[in-house]
């Protein structure tokens, strides 16, 4: 009986550790996503000033030169490509924005338009 209590206690302690680590990892992933959204919004509104040309309700922009991003359904890879290389009259941002900034603004637009 004592052996059984010991095994249950050991199992319980291991489960507590697993649950704690799992919770911590989930919490970190939310923090990472929030920081990427924050950087993406900063790049969209300030550094690249995407809203001058594009409408995106989440960013409060009402540009009418480029496509209304709220009406588009892009994949992340398409957004990264367009921001990096430019498309039509949109200039390329490679060399002006870091890859981290390009990825963040793409993530921001993707998350804001794919709900």
Functional labels for PLM-detected ranges:
Residues 1-7, 45-50, 69-70:
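Disordered, low-complexity tails and leader-like regions
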Residues 18, 52-55, 75, 95:
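Hydrophobic alpha-helical segments and their boundary regions
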Residues 23, 33, 51, 74-77:
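Amphipathic, positively biased hydrophobic alpha-helical segments used for protein targeting
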Residues 35-56, 85:
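Sequence/structural segment immediately N-terminal to covalent heme-attachment motifs in c-type
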Residues 63-115:
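Extracytoplasmic electron-transfer domains, predominantly the class I c-type cytochrome c fold
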